[in-house]
Amino acid sequence: MDSIRYIRKERGGNRVEKETTPSQSEWLVMEVLWAGDASMTAKEVIQKMQDTTSMSPRMVRVLLNRLWQKGIISYTVDEKDARVYHYFAKKSKEECQKEKSRKFVDSYFAGSNTNAMAALLESTRLTEEQYQELWNILQKKDRDKT
């Protein structure tokens, strides 16, 4: 699924592309939502995050709002209390990973998948199993093209 890119004008008339992927802090919130079986209230997200981060409840709410503005999550209003929202992920973890990876390659490797993969392979120590797994992925991609 292609993401929708939002363009806004900055002062001086320059066009700026609005980010549509989760930031590092937003990713922590998304991990909680992706791990959940169902939608969660802000209070539930905050409770789950208290075990792993020192982020304030206010900041979690701010991040939920940013994620909603980016179209990564959505919410339903509680039937009994209109002040309570139930948040859920609109984009899967895999979708976000692919989009983040694409932006990373575009930003740091001028869109070259080959250069990005070469840099990652050269900077990482892999086991024989990991090399084999990568080889299998490349072969599968090659078969899928034909």
Each model region followed by its residue ranges:
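Short beta-strand "wing" residues that participate in macromolecule-binding interfaces
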Residues: 75
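Short, cationic-aromatic polyanion-contact patches
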Residues: 21-25, 78-99
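Amphipathic alpha-helical dimerization/coiled-coil segments
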Residues: 98-144
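Short acidic, hydrophobic short linear motifs in intrinsically disordered regions
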Residues: 39-48
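Glycine-centered, phosphate/nucleic-acid-interacting loop/turn motifs that mediate DNA/RNA or nucleotide
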Residues: 71
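Short helix-coil junctions and helix-kink-helix linkers
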Residues: 47-55
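Short alpha-helical segments that sit at the start of domains
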Residues: 2-31, 110, 144
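Short amphipathic alpha-helical interaction segments
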Residues: 54-66
